[in-house]
């Protein structure tokens, strides 16, 4: 009965709202921060910020030993054992000790790698000037970014979701209070200090809460380090996956910088932020609620009952994703001519059509993302990596081809095409390996919302947003999508 309740539409809606609202608060604060950042840095400064942020993401993903993800599973196993046997509660502290020890080692490793690769990163990223010192100065930021990842894993594994929500809210507010005056006074020279302050505050806030759960400590003895090898083996697949995704982001930005300039990178990054962050609130529930529920379904790949239960879990999450995201994406596509000047300024209107096209990708992501969790939930790391490799290569090829064909607008089209192909590929792959079948209900929801988005795209490319017909027809289409989703959700949760 408990499993059925956890997989119910009402449960999914409840926790999507909970985690989405937490992220929504961060986004609202982020809107103000991005507005002032764009004002004080401009498109070129935003491009520079994007390149340094991508570098931090790539190096921290490559050097963190996969602890932010594998650490959750590693500690959670001990937590579950402790629930069954009081004598095993000490294992939780031991698991946390290992996570913190390897997080510290990974942090030093990441900082050293950053220093050593500084000249290489400069040559690969910039075709002008010498930014080697800037890349080297990112080392402390990477150090605290990796440390923060370890503390986040501890909070997730021990069920401290309220603390995580509080930490995220405080971090967003503090970053706003710090970054705006720094960018105002120092301009582009303030980018590196702000990135460091962000990483340090994230670690400090996480540590503030995690040390209440388990007292801080590390152990560098050989016996302790050897005991942590399972943690490293588990994290290997996550390291490669994170590295591929971060590397994809870095390669695309470096390509745009080489083929265009920092302004192009800044416009691209701003558009991607709107699409993937603001439209992605619905996805915030996936790691926190959906993945644990899916992982809790036992049985082999071919076990008929297990296959049915997994299909039910995935399809209900997918259906709710599509119903919630359809109206949001339609409204974003229609409202971007107003959203961009509010979030940034008039200089960023060059990303309008790119962002409108890329937004369609979010509907495809709503479909394939729950399905892509199947290999992870089964512990099939090799299949997960094969799937991720295909998707990353596909995205790089489509974005580069799109830019060559139609500039920045082509990049947006390339993203939408890549996500559409990825959806089809994931459906075929998951059916062959896991026996997954998309529900008829989910298929109908997808087709309806996709047609709505195509209607909105036709409107925004054929009618000027300065024309009143643009807004009249657009609002009617968005209301159609909203009404459809509202009626279907109300029916499902009854």
Language model regions located:
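Transmembrane helical elements of multi-pass membrane transporters/channels
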Residues: 14-31, 46, 171, 194-206, ...
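Hydrophobic transmembrane helix module of multi-pass membrane transport proteins
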Residues: 53-57, 101-250
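Membrane-proximal transmembrane or re-entrant/amphipathic helices at the cytosolic face
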Residues: 2-3, 457-494
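Alpha-helical transmembrane segments of multi-pass membrane transport and lipid-handling proteins
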Residues: 97-126, 176-180, 184, 286, ...
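Helix-loop junctions and terminal segments of transmembrane helices
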Residues: 64-83, 157, 215, 271, ...
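N-terminal membrane topogenesis motif
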Residues: 1-30, 90-97, 131-132, 210, ...
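Interhelical loop/hinge segments that connect adjacent transmembrane helices in multipass membrane
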Residues: 1-12, 204-249, 289-312, 433-447
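Membrane-interface junctions at transmembrane-helix termini in multi-pass inner-membrane proteins
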Residues: 143-167, 359-390, 430-432
């Amino acid at each position: 009965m408990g499993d059925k309740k956890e997989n119910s539409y009402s449960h999914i809606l409840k926790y999507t709202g909970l985690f989405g609202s937490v992220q929504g608060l961060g986004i609202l604060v982020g809107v103000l921060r991005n507005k002032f950042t764009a004002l004080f840095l401009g498109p070129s400064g935003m491009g520079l910020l994007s390149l340094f942020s991508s570098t931090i993401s790539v190096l921290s993903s490559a050097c963190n030993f996969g602890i932010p993800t594998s650490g959750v599973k590693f500690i959670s196993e001990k937590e579950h054992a402790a629930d069954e046997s009081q004598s095993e509660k000490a294992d939780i502290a031991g698991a946390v000790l290992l996570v913190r020890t390897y997080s510290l080692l990974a942090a030093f490793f990441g900082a050293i790698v950053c220093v050593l690769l500084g000249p290489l990163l400069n040559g690969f990223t910039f075709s002008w000037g010498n930014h080697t010192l800037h890349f080297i100065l990112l080392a402390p930021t990477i150090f605290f970014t990796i440390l923060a990842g370890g503390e986040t894993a501890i909070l997730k594994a021990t069920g401290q979701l309220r603390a995580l929500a509080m930490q995220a809210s405080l971090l967003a507010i503090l970053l706003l209070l710090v970054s705006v005056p720094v960018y105002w006074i120092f301009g582009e020279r303030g980018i590196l200090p702000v990135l460091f302050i962000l990483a340090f505050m994230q670690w400090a806030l996480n540590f503030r809460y995690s040390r209440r759960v388990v007292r801080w400590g590390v152990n560098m003895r050989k016996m302790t380090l050897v005991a942590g090898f399972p943690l490293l083996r588990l994290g290997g697949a996550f390291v490669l996956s994170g590295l591929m995704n971060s590397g994809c982001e870095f390669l695309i930005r470096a390509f745009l910088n080489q083929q265009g300039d920092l302004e192009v990178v800044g416009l691209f990054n701003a558009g991607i932020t709107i699409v993937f962050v603001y439209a992605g609130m619905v996805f915030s529930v996936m790691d926190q609620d959906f993945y644990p529920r899916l992982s809790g379904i036992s049985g082999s790949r071919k076990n008929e009952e297990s296959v049915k239960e997994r299909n039910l879990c995935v399809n209900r999450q997918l259906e709710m994703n599509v119903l919630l995201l359809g109206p949001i994406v339609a409204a974003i596509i229609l409202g971007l001519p107003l959203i961009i000047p509010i979030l940034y300024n008039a200089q960023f209107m060059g990303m309008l059509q790119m962002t409108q096209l890329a937004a369609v990708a979010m509907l495809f992501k709503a479909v394939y993302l729950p399905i892509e969790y199947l290999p992870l939930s089964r512990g099939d790391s090799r299949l997960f990596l094969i799937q991720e490799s295909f998707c990353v290569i596909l995205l790089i090829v489509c974005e580069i081809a799109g830019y060559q064909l139609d500039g920045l607008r082509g990049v947006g089209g390339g993203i939408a095409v890549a996500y559409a192909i990825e959806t089809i590929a994931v459906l075929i792959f998951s059916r062959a390996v896991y026996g997954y079948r998309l529900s008829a209900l989910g298929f109908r929801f997808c087709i309806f919302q996709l047609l709505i988005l195509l209607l909105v795209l036709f409107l925004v490319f054929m009618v000027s947003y300065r024309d009143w017909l643009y807004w009249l027809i657009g609002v009617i289409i968005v209301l159609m999508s909203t009404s459809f989703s509202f009626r279907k959700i109300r029916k499902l949760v009854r």
